[in-house]
Amino acid sequence: DALAKGGDLFAGYTPEAIRVGDTAGDEPHASLYDAWGEYYRLYRQRFPDKFLFCNLFPAGASAKKLGAKNYAEYVAQFVEKVPADFISLDQYPFFSISLLKGIAFRLCLHTYDVVASACRESGRDFWLYFQTQGNWFDLIYALPSFEQIRWQAYAALAYGAKCLMHVSYTP
């Protein structure tokens, strides 16, 4: 909305020297990509020494949530419209519910494949949040073992990931 009004998006913003960048958002609908692309350009112009972070959905989100007919289109539209130097996402493949366990690895590897291909084709880095804890949100995620954490890291690196990240949620 502020972008459409044409005002100074950063008028009340003071970048702190200790902060390397900012977050644009998390898991956007593809309909936001045009605005995000413009925001990225303006941010880079105003703060050339900082970087703007965003994080996409992994494969498995519905077409309605993605705003695209499938995951490959969702990622391709991001690459086309948002001038980020990387594609970042979170992928949590270990579930405590049996039904989800069967599809989780296929979705995980599909995510890695789509994003890695898009990164290679566009010259971007592949960044990944991987699963290091369980039982948050709605208790569907399993606590991964050391071997499962290692598998995620090695699999992501095999697909060309350049940055591996994790989060820690606490009550």
Segments predicted by a language model, with ranges:
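Glycan-processing catalytic domains of CAZymes
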Residues: D1-P171
